[in-house]
């Protein structure tokens, strides 16, 4: 009988219950340590994508403004990216009036450069479908002098002031958007 028992032990292939419990415990510890880091990484990549999308729209507006074909008016162009409402680019003319002819030109220029289905109106472009919404809903709203007027809540945006001489200044909201620390 002892010979039969010893022979079975030699032929036994596999893991014991204790070994399996130890492996499961090690995996649980690793998941517990790495899961928070993974979620931080995912959120950071979402914010990076949002900042990149906003910067791309700002660059395209600069391209359109520098091309005499599109007759970009002097005024303030406000870009707002929202988690729920998509993206809107709005022109507020310095004189308070918006010329339909030149508005049609800059909206046509922006529509031709930006991908997606943009809806054009007299003084704005908008995209409300899921193509260009914020990926992250954890942005901290800017307050005080740092805020762009129409950027509220967890939205991000930029205000581009085009002077009569064509010079452009850009203000981001929140201001930490440019440095990626928000």
Question: At which residue positions do the language-model features occur?
Answer:
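N-terminal single-pass transmembrane signal-anchor helix
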Residues: 12-38
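Alpha-helix exit/C-cap motif
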Residues: 59-84
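Long, charged/polar, surface-exposed segments that mediate recognition or autoinhibition
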Residues: 109-110, 114, 122
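Aliphatic-rich helix starts adjacent to a transmembrane/signal segment
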Residues: 11, 39-58, 65
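Papain-like cysteine protease catalytic cores
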Residues: 105
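Short, surface-exposed interaction loops/tails
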Residues: 82-85, 90-95, 101-102, 117-120, ...
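N-terminal leader/signal peptides at the extreme start of proteins
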Residues: 1-13
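Short, flexible helix-adjacent loops and helix caps
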Residues: 6, 43, 69-70
């Amino acid at each position: 009988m002892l010979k039969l028992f010893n022979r079975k032990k030699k032929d036994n292939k596999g893991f014991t219950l204790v070994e399996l419990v130890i492996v499961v415990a090690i995996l649980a510890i690793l998941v517990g340590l790495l899961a928070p880091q993974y979620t931080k990484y995912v959120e950071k990549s979402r914010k990076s994508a949002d900042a990149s999308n906003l910067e791309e729209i700002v660059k395209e507006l600069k391209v359109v403004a520098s091309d005499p074909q599109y007759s970009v008016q002097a005024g303030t162009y406000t870009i707002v990216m929202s988690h729920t409402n998509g993206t809107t680019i709005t022109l507020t003319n310095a004189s308070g009036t918006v010329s339909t002819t030149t508005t049609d030109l800059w909206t046509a220029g922006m529509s031709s450069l930006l991908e997606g289905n943009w809806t054009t109106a007299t003084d704005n472009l908008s995209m409300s479908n899921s193509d260009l919404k914020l990926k992250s809903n954890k942005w901290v709203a800017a307050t005080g002098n740092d805020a762009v007027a129409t950027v509220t809540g967890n939205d991000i945006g930029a205000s581009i002031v085009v002077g009569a001489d064509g010079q452009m200044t850009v203000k981001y909201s929140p201001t930490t958007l440019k440095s990626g620390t928000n």
